[in-house]
């Protein structure tokens, strides 16, 4: 699958803040705190502190300390990190509904009824064939671990313990097709009071995913 370069996106610097307070509630928001310097694909949760993969999808971690999984240059192209030297990469769109996600823990449970802002930066990998139009965010009360490498659907979440009902979708007027600059995504939301973790990715199957073909290739994917 790594040779498909279907819809790859790089993610950098996550932030969840309460209105009126500037404290970032995401632990290790820019992926700078790592356990191991990355040397292979799909090893994010063993390499990065406080981040995990909620499914069997093999999300990647890149850091300037590594030759094999380095920044700014790696197997998916070249992209410097604006904050430090680390970022992650995942498939937002790929054949057979294959998906990759990342899960973060929050410093504290969000307060019920309070307004928050979530923001993060994305950049389409140079070797991607497709760009997507929207990013999904799902909050959960407990850590999520589901035995699938395909789309995380509402059916999956309905079977989990705890509240997973707070979900967001950040849409863009165009498509997230910039391969040079980091694009900032921001969304406001009201907390349920049960949010301890957040998951980022594409929660729609291929048929429902709004996408734009950036290159004419036989392979079909979107990696960021």
Regions inferred by a protein language model and the residue ranges of each:
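Bacterial Sec-dependent N-terminal signal peptides
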Residues: 1-26
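Short aromatic-acidic-glycine turn motif
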Residues: 143-150
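Serine/threonine-rich low-complexity intrinsically disordered regions
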Residues: 2-5, 127, 147, 156
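Aromatic (Trp/Tyr/Phe) and Gly/Pro-enriched flexible surface segments
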Residues: 23-112, 121, 125, 132, ...
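Short coil-to-beta strand junction motifs in C2/discoidin
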Residues: 130-136
């Amino acid at each position: 699958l790594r040779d498909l370069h279907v819809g790859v996106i790089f993610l950098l610097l996550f932030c969840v803040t309460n209105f009126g307070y500037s404290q970032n509630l995401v632990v290790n928001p820019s992926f700078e705190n790592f356990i191991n310097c990355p040397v292979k694909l799909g090893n994010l949760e063993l390499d990065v502190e406080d981040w995990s993969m909620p499914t069997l999808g093999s999300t990647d971690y890149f850091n300037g300390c590594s030759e094999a999984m380095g920044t700014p240059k790696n197997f998916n192209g070249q992209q410097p990190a604006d904050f430090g030297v680390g970022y992650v990469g995942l498939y937002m769109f790929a054949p057979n509904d294959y998906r990759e996600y990342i899960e973060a823990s929050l410093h504290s449970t969000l307060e019920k009824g309070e307004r928050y802002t979530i923001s993060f930066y994305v950049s389409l990998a140079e070797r991607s064939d497709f760009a997507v139009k929207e990013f999904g965010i799902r909050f959960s009360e407990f850590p999520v671990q589901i035995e699938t490498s395909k789309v995380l659907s509402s059916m999956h979440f309905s079977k989990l313990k705890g509240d997973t009902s707070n979900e967001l979708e950040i849409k863009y007027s165009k498509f997230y097709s910039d391969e040079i600059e980091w694009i900032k995504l921001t969304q406001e939301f009201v907390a349920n009071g049960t949010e301890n973790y957040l998951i980022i990715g594409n929660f729609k199957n291929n048929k429902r995913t709004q996408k734009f073909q950036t290159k004419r290739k036989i392979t079909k994917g979107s990696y960021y």
